[in-house]
């Protein structure tokens, strides 16, 4: 049979019903196979027709499967053949006849379905018995098609196009599926004003990602549903266009345009009752464009200009500029409505409004302190995204995490059960032994197991009871939510009896039960309230900043910063005090919060602790000495090397890779940045530092603004080092600083120096300082050896020897490190490799005349 004039979906149904016969080992291809294939087709057209008539597709499928199972199975060997039955061919021919009589150029799947109602075999009888006849089906097809003819091979794609390629936002509002919208009244009012115009009544919402553009549409849908809009919009529906569904599966040229035209045709026929919402409006420009074909935006322009299409677009400012503004004809048909980022206070209001939705979804409770923390902490610490999206994400993730914890065993109970399993394994092993010690151990373990089993049973009982109470509370919340939706519907329908019953009877009763359930003590086994600490924990995981930095009293922590830094850096009290004061000023909030936490220029000779202080500062502030970006400025001696910091300009190799400085800070906004040997860099490089030091921001080569507000900038230099090396202990510090600053001012411009928080001098180390450093360095070596279970001991004479030999005023502490390597570490390494020192040994180091002696104690 020739099926050239069948649509692609119809051909697929015919192929599938043939495969079904082969799969079931049936010799004939019957109308029953055709009916089974139609009931399983993917477009949903047949299901829509059956629902329209009042049939039940699931019941039909069951009856068809029952009849298919009755057909005899025949094992067809290589010489056998499966053939179409006369009845099956008759049905297909009838479908062709019906299509021709209806004025269709192609036979569609609904025409095949209609032809089955004329069938006298079991397939036709099943349809008749379920109330599906040719008359009812013809009326349902007419209603589905809305007068359209099947004149293309993809005709089915144009049926009910809005339902297929769109989402009814107003219907979602009606069913209570949308979150409440808080604080966007001005933007919604502006959109309503534009929609109420006679011509070019098409607003486009422009704003950064995550500020709530789509939420404004949902708010408008809720207002339309509540009839809180002008009369011109009261009967409107908002349909969100799914551009992905429009494009998907459009194999042939012109098919995409056909689908879009069918959508626009339905909108036009609605006489202004449908408002089309296109999220990511810029996707329309160029979509569907092939050689000589028009893109989607050109199909919209005529209807937009005539006012036949009510359309709301949403896009970001960058994409609007890049795509929409370039097409002036499209841009002038839309009226921009700018959507700004809400303030922290507005975000808190938004979060309070949607709180119940998240509590209901995750079956947890959200404290108000968690809401405030989500808004304030996300604004302070997550700088590359926008409110309220980033705050909502924090609440959502914290709730999700708690939900997972609630569904698993409490930690205490889990540890108890693991201990029980461990004891059972030990008992099984000990029962194989017959000695007295094993018998005593079995007795003690049996007694312990008995106690633990009893404790585990009690805790399990309490845990299950607590879980049951939480599940009961969750069920009551769902009932309360549904009751409120029913109340809204009853009030709108003026069903006063039902509204009164819900408002004064059912809802108060559920609320009383819910309050009683929430007040029940769960014995501390389950934590169900999301708190400020949970939000802070999520922030900590996202950004890498330690949680205690945000929640512990920073006043107490920062008051002891000198003490903590002095444990690592010796002999630089003035430098430690200067950097501590600057950090305290920043953290106490009495300086500009838009600047870095601190910016310092460390001046001093080599080996006096400039870099070590920077590492110690990173360890104190971020609990990680490696939270440090070290940039060796001797690598930036040429003017063009500045591009390595912020990224290569457009058109150059490496443009898409970003810069060393900007990319590191984007990925980890909380770190100490060390510009080492800064005087060796080209002077033009300091021009980019001006905006970092002053505004706490820097724009990279791709136009992305990188936030430096949570970094500490440290620059080190050897300028004036010879003055500091030759400084006498009783010499006036201010005089020395003036002499050093003359060198500094000769190299750096005043506007650069003026933006630094502190210029700190590092003085040369004296013998007492070296002695303290010896103890620190040997302490580090002691920790390393302890990992191998080797104990290192040293007496006063060894410390004095190392301090004397390692002291060099010109080179600071670095010669000491080399001395310890040469005198101690090299000898220890040889002894360990030779087997003289092994795990469990104690190694004593003492001075013997003019050298160190290593003594090994077993």
Swiss-Prot record:
ATP 2 binds at residues 604-611. GO terms for cellular component: cytoplasm. Residues 392-523 form a coiled coil. Its main location: cytoplasm. Residues 342-544 are annotated as: Linker. It holds the Pfam family ClpB_D2-small. Residues 554-764 are annotated as: NBD2. Residues 6-71 are annotated as: Repeat 1. Residues 160-341 are annotated as: NBD1. One of its GO terms (molecular function) is ATP binding. ATP 1 binds at residues 207-214. It is found in: Cytoplasm. Residues 765-858 are annotated as: C-terminal. The Clp repeat (R) domain probably functions as a substrate-discriminating domain, recruiting aggregated proteins to the ClpB hexamer and/or stabilizing bound proteins. The NBD2 domain is responsible for oligomerization, whereas the NBD1 domain stabilizes the hexamer probably in an ATP-dependent manner. The movement of the coiled-coil domain is essential for ClpB ability to rescue proteins from an aggregated state, probably by pulling apart large aggregated proteins, which are bound between the coiled-coils motifs of adjacent ClpB subunits in the functional hexamer. Homohexamer. The oligomerization is ATP-dependent. PANTHER family: ATP-DEPENDENT CLP PROTEASE, HEAT SHOCK PROTEIN 104. Part of a stress-induced multi-chaperone system, it is involved in the recovery of the cell from heat-induced damage, in cooperation with DnaK, DnaJ and GrpE. Acts before DnaK, in the processing of protein aggregates. Protein binding stimulates the ATPase activity; ATP hydrolysis unfolds the denatured protein aggregates, which probably helps expose new hydrophobic binding sites on the surface of ClpB-bound aggregates, contributing to the solubilization and refolding of denatured protein aggregates by DnaK. This is Chaperone protein ClpB.
């Amino acid at each position: 049979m020739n099926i050239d004039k069948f649509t692609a979906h119809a051909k697929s149904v015919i192929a599938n019903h043939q495969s079904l016969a082969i799969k079931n080992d049936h010799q004939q291809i019957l109308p029953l196979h055709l009916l089974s294939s139609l009931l399983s087709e993917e477009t949903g057209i047949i299901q829509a027709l059956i629902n329209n008539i009042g049939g039940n597709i699931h019941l039909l499928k069951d009856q068809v499967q029952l009849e298919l199972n009755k057909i005899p199975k025949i094992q067809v060997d290589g010489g056998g053949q499966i053939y179409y039955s006369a009845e099956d061919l008759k049905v297909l021919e009838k479908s062709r006849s019906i299509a021709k009589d209806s004025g269709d150029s192609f036979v569609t799947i609904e025409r095949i379905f209609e032809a089955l109602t004329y069938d006298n075999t079991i397939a036709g009888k099943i349809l008749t018995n379920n109330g599906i006849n040719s008359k009812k089906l013809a009326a349902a097809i007419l209603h589905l098609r809305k007068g359209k003819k099947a004149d293309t091979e993809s005709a089915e794609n144009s049926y009910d196009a809005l339902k297929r390629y769109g989402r009814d936002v107003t219907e979602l509002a009606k069913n209570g599926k949308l979150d409440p919208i808080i604080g966007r009244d001005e933007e919604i009012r502006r959109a309503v004003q534009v929609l109420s115009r006679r011509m070019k009544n098409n607003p486009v919402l422009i704003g950064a990602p995550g500020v709530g553009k789509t939420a404004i549409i949902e708010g408008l849908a809720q207002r339309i549903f509540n009839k809180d809009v002008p009369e011109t919009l009261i009967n409107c529906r908002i349909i969100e266009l799914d551009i992905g569904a429009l494009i998907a599966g459009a194999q042939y040229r012109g098919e995409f345009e056909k689908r879009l035209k069918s959508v626009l045709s339905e909108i036009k026929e609605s006489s202004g009752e449908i408002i089309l919402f296109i999220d990511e409006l810029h996707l329309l420009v160029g979509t569907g464009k092939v050689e000589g074909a028009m893109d989607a935006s050109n199909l919209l322009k005529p209807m937009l200009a005539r006012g036949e299409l009510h359309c709301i677009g949403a896009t970001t400012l960058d994409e609007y500029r890049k795509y929409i503004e370039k097409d002036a004809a499209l841009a002038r048909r839309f009226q921009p409505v700018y959507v700004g980022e809400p303030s922290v206070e507005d975000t808190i209001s938004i979060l309070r409004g949607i709180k119940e939705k998240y509590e209901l979804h995750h079956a947890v409770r959200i404290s108000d302190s968690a809401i405030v923390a989500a808004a304030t902490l996300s604004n302070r610490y997550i700088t590359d995204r926008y409110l309220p999206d980033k705050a909502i994400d924090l609440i959502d993730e914290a709730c999700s995490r708690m939900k997972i914890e609630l569904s698993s065993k409490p930690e205490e109970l889990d540890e108890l059960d693991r201990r029980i399993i461990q004891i059972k394994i030990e008992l099984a092993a000990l029962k194989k032994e017959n000695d007295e010690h094993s018998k005593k151990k079995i007795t003690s373990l049996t007694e312990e197991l008995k106690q633990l089993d009893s404790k585990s049973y009690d805790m399990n009982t309490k845990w299950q009871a607590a879980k049951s109470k939480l599940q009961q509370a969750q069920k009551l919340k769902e009932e309360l939510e549904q009751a409120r939706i029913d109340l809204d519907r009853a009030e709108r329908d003026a069903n006063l009896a039902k509204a009164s019953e819900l408002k004064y009877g059912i809802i108060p009763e559920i609320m009383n039960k819910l309050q009683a359930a929430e007040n029940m003590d769960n014995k501390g086994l389950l934590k169900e309230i999301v708190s400020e600490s949970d939000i802070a924990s999520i922030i900590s995981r996202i950004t890498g900043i330690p949680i205690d930095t945000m929640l512990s009293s920073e006043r107490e922590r920062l008051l002891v910063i000198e003490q903590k830094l002095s444990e690592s850096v010796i002999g630089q009290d003035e430098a430690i005090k200067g950097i501590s004061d600057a950090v305290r000023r920043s953290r106490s909030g009495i300086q500009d919060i838009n600047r870095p936490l601190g910016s310092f220029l460390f001046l001093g000779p080599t080996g006096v602790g400039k870099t070590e202080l920077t590492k110690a500062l990173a360890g104190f502030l971020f609990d990680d000495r490696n939270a440090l970006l070290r940039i060796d400025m001797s690598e930036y001696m040429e003017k063009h090397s500045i591009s390595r910091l912020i990224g290569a300009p457009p058109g150059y190799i490496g443009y898409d890779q970003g810069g060393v400085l900007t990319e590191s800070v984007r990925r980890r906004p909380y770190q100490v940045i060390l510009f080492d040997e800064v005087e060796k860099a080209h002077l033009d490089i300091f021009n980019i530092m001006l905006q970092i030091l002053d505004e706490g921001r820097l724009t990279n080569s791709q136009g992305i603004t990188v936030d430096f507000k949570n970094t500490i900038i440290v620059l080190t230099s050897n300028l004036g080092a010879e003055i500091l090396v030759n400084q006498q202990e009783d010499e006036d510090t201010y005089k020395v600083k003036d002499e050093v600053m003359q060198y500094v001012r000769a190299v750096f411009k005043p506007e650069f120096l003026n933006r630094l928080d502190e210029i700190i001098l590092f003085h040369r180390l004296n013998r007492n300082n070296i002695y303290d450093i010896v103890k620190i360095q040997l302490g580090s070596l002691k920790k390393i050896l302890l990992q191998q279970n080797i104990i290192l001991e040293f007496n006063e004479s060894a410390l004095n020897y190392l301090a004397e030999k390692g002291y060099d005023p010109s080179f600071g502490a670095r010669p000491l490190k080399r001395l310890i390597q040469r005198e101690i570490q090299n000898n220890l390494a040889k002894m360990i490799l030779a087997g003289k020192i092994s795990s469990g040994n104690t190694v004593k180091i003492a001075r013997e005349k003019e050298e160190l002696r290593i003594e090994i104690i077993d």
